[in-house]
Amino acid sequence: LQGLYIKVEDGSCEVIGSDLDLVIKAKLNVDSMVGGECLVNARILSEVVRKMSSGEIVFSDLGNEVMIEADKSEYKLRKLDHLTYPKALLENSFEQENSQKLAPFELFTALRKVGIAASPEGGKPILTGVFFDNDGEKTTLVSTDSYRLATNTISNLPIDDAGIVSYRSLNETIKLFEDSEQDIFINSTERELHFYNEKYYTSVRKLEGNYPEYQALFPKENVFSIEVDKKKILESLDRSTVVAEGFIPVTLKVVDENNLNISSTNKDIGGGVE
């Protein structure tokens, strides 16, 4: 899985990469003199292509190596054994007729809003994901790392069994499709969520387990409620938490109906007040 699987056939090139939690496929048209397939170290190949000057790049199969040429640059990379690549990753594991069209803007915007509260990789697995809580025509997206909670409700999501999906994988999917102004297709199976169009495809593994009862975390009544200017509160938080590191708590104190005091204290460094 450290390699990129490259397959060339009839003027089309397909590139596949995966870490098992996420599968990404990209298709592009090429001028091919001969078809074939190979597996090349993903990190090195990506770095080589990124550093090459813009323009035409030529790939040649030399048996145990792949030669890459562009302008005055030439690289020869040793191939990995493509026969060891998992066959399941080379084929689509869903029935295309069950796919639904999706205008991605609303979904992707909502995912980015709630994703900031998801636990980072390495934390409790279920909390690294976004929970799709369906209720009729509305779907509430939920994420929490147990310190904070974010929700956002969208309408008309064409599937109702998305479950819990890793935010890291969803964020990579957003990056892939965010520049497209056209609808994409979405397909949900028992274990995976699939997104695709004519050029790109991603398969995101669903997380197993039960998501926390997030609705119980909302208070039945508010001790106080304040309305603030978004830009001002973000700038104030940024200034007052310069000395905060990790999970140093931030204290919010309502001084009166017109003033809010924001402070943080780090016993090793100092403190800040806004």
Task: Pin down the residues of each PLM region.
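Structural preference for solvent-exposed beta-strand-turn elements
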Residues: L1-E274
